[in-house]
Amino acid sequence: ARLAEHGVEVIGHVRSDEGQSLLDSWLTVIRLGRPHVTVKWAQSLDGRAAAADGTSQWITGPAARADVHRRRATADAIVAGIGTVLADDPALTARDVDGTLFPHQPIPVVLGQRCIPDDAQERQHPHPLIHRDGNDLPLLLSDLRDRGIQRVFVEGGPTIASAFIRDALADEILTYIAPTLLG
C-alpha cells in the first residue's frame, strides 16, 4: 500500500504460495510465539505404524526415507518419544542416501520420563541431546524458541504425534503410507 501511495506500480500476490512457504517458520514464531511444527509419521495401508511384534522399523521405501532425511535437514530440531528411542534407537540425524551427514543437523529432542541408554545413537549426535518429560508441549516449544529454534520436525510414534495434534500444535502434517498391510 505504501509503495502504491508513492506512485509505484504494485502487483500483489505474485508467487505468494512460494513466499508463504519460505516464511512459514518465521511467521509461526512471530504470530504464535513458538516454532513451526511438522508432525511426520509413516503407516501401512491398514493404518499401523508398526507390526504387533515391533519388527517393522522401516515400513516405507528408500524414496520416502530420502525425503524424510531431506526434510530433517531443513529443521532446527527433531523430536522423538522415548518409546521410539528405546524400540528403534534412531540416530535422529539428517543423512544423504549414501549415509553421509547433511551439513545442517537438527538438534535431537527426546520426550519421555524413562532414561536414554548410555549407548543410544542419540548420544553420538553432532548436537547435544535435549531430554524433556514431554508433559507440557507448549512449554517445550517455548524453550526451543528461546534457543533460537524455528522449525521442529516431530518424528515420534503415534503417541507423540497424537499429542502435538491434540494440543493443536501441528502446523503441518506429513504422512507416508506404505503399500503394505501389517495387521
Place the predicted regions along the sequence by residue.
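Zn2+-dependent cytidine deaminase-like catalytic core
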Residues: 1-18, 163-165
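Residue-level detector of structured alpha->beta connecting loops
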Residues: 7, 75-76, 169
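Short, ordered loop/turn segments at secondary-structure junctions
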Residues: 15, 114, 178-179
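A gly/proline- and charged-residue-enriched helix-loop-helix capping module
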Residues: 20-24
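Active-site ligand-binding patch in enzyme domains
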Residues: 25-32, 36-153, 159-162
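Active-site proximal loops enriched in glycine and acidic residues that flank catalytic Cys/His/Asp
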Residues: 82, 156, 174-178
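A short acidic Gly-Thr/Ser loop motif
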Residues: 156-158, 167-168
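Flexible, gly/pro- and Lys/Arg-enriched active-site loops
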Residues: 167-183
